[in-house]
Each structure stands twice: as C-alpha cells, then as structure tokens.
Amino acid sequence: MIKIIDRTLSCLDNFSIDADSLKKLMLLLLKLNCDKLEISEKVYQAIKPLPPKEKFILRVHDICDLEKYPEFKEFVCESVHIDGDRRICKEFQMNSVGEMDQLGARTTTERIRLSGLDDILLSDYTNIFKKLKNVLKGPIEFCPMNRMKCATAIAMEWAFASDNAEIVTSFGSLNHYVPLEELIMALYMHHCPTNHSECRYFAKIRDLIENATHVPFAKHKAVIGKEIFQVESGIHVDGIMKNSLCYEPYNPELVGQKREIILGKKSGRASLTLKMKQLHLKLSELLLPQILQQVKELSIEKNDCVSDQEFIQIVNDVTRMNSIGAFTAKVREG
C-alpha cells in the first residue's frame, strides 16, 4: 500500500497569492486523490474553513501553536522537543547518507518525516532502507529531495521496498521535493493501484501555479512541461502516426495535454501531411516538396518554428504561384 502526502500548499508562503487562487489550487489537488494534504499556517488562514471530511496536515513552526488549531488532528513540525504526542510528526533533514550515524539521537517522536538523502542512489540504498526501518521503529514519512533530479526514482525504490510506504511530494517539485505528478505517473506506468483519471488535472494545476507565482515550470519538464508533446522531426511524426507508443509512453490526453506537430527545419513530408489534415487543407502532393523547402527556409531564417498562420500563408503562396505558372503555360501553348 502506497500513501501520498502532498505538501504543495505548504510550499507557497514566499509568494503573494490571492485567496481565490489558493482555494482553486486546493480543490484541484483534492481531485488528485492524495491521502493527505499538508498546508501551512499562512495558507490556512487565507482559505479557511477547509472542506469537511478531507485529510489535512497543518505545518507549524512552533510546537506551542498546536492549541491554536483544535480543528486539526495532525501536525508536522521541524522543532519538536516533546515525545508521546501522536498528533505530531517530527521532520528532520539528512543532507547525505553520511549523516546516518546521527539518526538514533534525533528520533524523539513516534512518527518521523525523513527529508533529504539526495545521494542515496550512489550507495547501497537497499541496505540503507533496511537500516532506516530498523532504527526508526514507528511510521516513516519518506521525503527524498530532488536537487539531483532523481527523487522520483528514490521514492519508487522506497515504495517497492516497503509494505506501507508513505511518500511526501510537491507538485512540480516545488521546494525540491518529489514531483507529485511524476510519482503518480510512475505508479500508473508500473500498474500500481491508482486512479489514472486524476492525471488529467495536471495541466490545470501547472497553469494555476504558474499564473499565481509568476514562475514558469521548465517547458520540457517531465509529465507537465508545455512542450514535451511537441514533435518536429519528420521521422518522429511518421512513427507517431503509425504507433504513438514508439515515442510516447502514454497519451498526452491522459495528463491533460495535447500532441502538437511543430513545423521547422527538421520537418518532413509526414509532418506536412499531418499538419494539413489538422488545418483541413487540401492540395496536390506534387506541391509538398516546394512547401517543405519554404518551411525549412523560414524556420532557419527565424531560428524558430513556423506558426500555423505562416504555414497557411506558405501553402497559399505556393498554390497561387503554381496556378499562375500553369495558366501561363497554357497561354503559351495556345
């Protein structure tokens, strides 16, 4: 059994985001069916009251603040010096595998959130996992960091090595935690129990966070990047038309995106054929070489792809010039 605790709503305190956007984000995150959502005190004050019958965890900076929030049953805190309170999950950071020896002296609560361990894949991680479970007798919320861009792989290894894994994520790897969208898709691709219909909200969540924080995600970021389903190469387009699994492990629609054929210097006849079909353009295949040549020349001149409007203009120009040429030839023959 794999449980996901998402902390996206506790990663936004450094941004000035209006309450309406925060509420919309919360509702979209709830649609992803995570087991729990972590929320910061600042965000909670902006969007309260929370929906009933949902599982929220409140992140507090001081253990003394717990009594201010009787409506919460679970808390997470980095500075805990009290033992025996089952409401509290103590989070502590292990920046490297070399800090394993300090583990025993720092476990003072029954539930532990372990963050960090970016470099664990460089070591014998299976034995390290066993040691962690032997030292930490209680439940472990595992929160590998993503500074080395392999947190999803670490989380998946932990999940497969545990009977009841609890993994902490953030959407888009905010604050360098396990990317929620990558973990959900990894579980889906490995046929783990998950509701794939939740994935269609990824693009909406991405757009909402980008608009609210004014910080865009990388265009080629796994799962949610805006350009990951853009295809320019003629060979790739031809392969996708025959069998999309040649280049795409899943359909773009599954994650709320669409495949887009990009015309440029790497395009081929297959690209033009599919683009004309998408734009409902009809013309003789004899004109494709001329059109393709102009597409490549324009792309090189712009140092960018050719837009649909520019492509339509090229098609119209080539068609018109060939019509004029054909008419002139007939006149000469006459």
Predicted regions and their residues:
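Terminal or standalone catalytic/regulatory effector modules within metabolic enzymes
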Residues: M1, D6, L28-C64, P252-G334
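N-terminal small/glycine-rich loop or linker at the start of catalytic domains
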Residues: M1-I17, K131-G138
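Active-site pocket-lining/capping segments in soluble small-molecule metabolic enzymes
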Residues: K3-D6, L58-I63, H81-I82, F92-N95, ...
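Hydrophobic alpha-helical scaffolding
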Residues: F15, M148, S173, N195, ...
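General structural feature for long, well-ordered alpha-helical segments within catalytic domains
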Residues: S21-L25, D124-I128, A151-I154, P179, ...
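Active-site beta->alpha loop and helix N-cap motifs at the rims of alpha/beta catalytic domains
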Residues: K23, K31-S123
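Surface-exposed amphipathic alpha-helices with a cationic face
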Residues: L27-L30, I47-K53, P70, G84-R86, ...
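Catalytic alpha/beta core domains of metabolic enzymes, predominantly
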Residues: L117-M241, L245
